[in-house]
Amino acid sequence: TYYANLIMQELDERNEPPSKTFEYINRFARFVAEHNGAAYECRVTHVPLTEQVRAVVLEPPFGSNITVLEDAKTRALLVIDSGFRCCARYTLRQLRTIFPDFDERKREMLLTHSDSDHTGLAESMPVIWCSQRTADCFANESLGLPSPREASATGLPYYRLNKLITEYAVPPLNRLRILNTSHGDDEQPISPIGAFLFGDMRFNVLQGNGGHVPGETMLIDPVHRVAFTGDDYINPHNMTPPQKEFDRLAPYLARSVNVDSPRYHAILRAVLAMLDGKGYLIFPGHGGVVQRTEAM
């Protein structure tokens, strides 16, 4: 009721009819209910990356892509982002079908950022890698403080309702492991903060300066030409019909998917300059994998 009242107050101040926004909230909740449970279907893509590592990408009807890297030698798994928490058991069911011994394997998670549509499997992961700023965000949330998206009066009610509808919970703080070996340079759109090893791959870990959300990170393997961009680059040209429908709802409710749109566009330009046309296999935060021969 409190957050609904905040929305009513905001709409009244802007002379906008509350019925329109609450209809979108109703459609958002109905969409989540109708595409969850037995109706939760992911587009699954299997992609070999190196002689030792392969990727399996799950694209749910709503929420972030869920990418699992598998090390053929050690059988270890790395889960990069993981959709919404309200879908967790159905995501796990699909992962256990692909990897029948999923629960027995060494498995870790890596979060590209703190948004609720990326953290859904956090409670099922023994280790969760993230940037220091992402960890700080979770620590603040655990104390009841607003996330970066809730810092504004306009963002607070919408994101709190989103979290309620999608059953968000702060990831377990005692499982967080920090990617940073340096702080990065916020004078630049993207800057290096460390490195991450998995199998025979070595990723440069880059951090954006807070365009999409503070703590946003990307993983770039320049040797094997593989990039995980989080939401600093998404692929709207190759989404499933449910994903497209959901994406039409979310920005209206949140007003913007970015904390700082000018910074986000500077980050996107830097990402395009670094990757586009250079033979990278690109795994976006949302939408299909961009093949090496495709333009971003």
PLM regions and their residue ranges:
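Conserved beta-strand hairpin/beta-sheet module of binuclear metal-dependent hydrolase folds
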Residues: Y40-I98, T217-N235
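Metallo-beta-lactamase
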Residues: F84-C86, R202-Q291
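Long amphipathic alpha-helical scaffold segments
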Residues: T1-L49
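Conserved catalytic scaffold of divalent metal-dependent phosphoesterases
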Residues: C130-T134, L143, G194, D200-M201, ...
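Hydrophobic "anchor" residues on beta-strands that sit immediately upstream
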Residues: L77-V79, E108-M109, V127, A227, ...
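Alpha-helix termini
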Residues: K73, R96-D103, A273-G279
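Active-site HxH/HxHxD metal-binding segment of metal-dependent hydrolases
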Residues: R96-D186, M296
